[in-house]
Amino acid sequence: MRPLPPTLRENRRYILIKVEAGEITQKDIYRAVADSVRDLFGDVGASRIHPAVVWSEGEYAIVRCSRGHELEMTAALACVTKAGGSPAVFRTVKTSGTVLGAKKGISVKKRYLHED
């Protein structure tokens, strides 16, 4: 079966988050995000939002969701209190239409922090 052309694929948004927690894995981040989305919006809402963690490195991670559900996703991220058994806070840094655009938020954030 051939893949769908780009015009027929579902559009997605990528949210760059800063993870303020101890040492946690990408799997722990996904579980915390999925549980938070399910708790806030139920199974039907979670199926509409399609949460996924596509990248994590150090204190940053990129979470994917369906276009049009960015606000619900950021609300769910703000409600996370635990990840991997330890206290955690997920702070939204940037929302973008591509992974590369979301990653650019890391360098911009660091540039502003180091200008002092």
What kind of feature is each model-predicted range?
Residues 9-54, 93, 102, 106, ...:
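Surface-exposed, low-hydrophobicity interaction/linker segments
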Residues 2-6:
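Short beta-strand/turn micro-motifs at beta-sheet edges
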Residues 18, 62-64, 91:
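Beta-strand cores of modular interaction/reader domains in eukaryotic scaffold and signaling proteins
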Residues 64-71:
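Helix N-cap motif at beta-to-alpha junctions
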Residues 12-14, 60, 87-89:
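Broad gene-expression machinery/nucleic-acid interaction feature
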Residues 73-80:
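Short amphipathic alpha-helices in soluble, non-transmembrane regions
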Residues 55-62:
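The conserved glycine-aromatic submotif of the RRM
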Residues 80-116:
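Long, charge-dense
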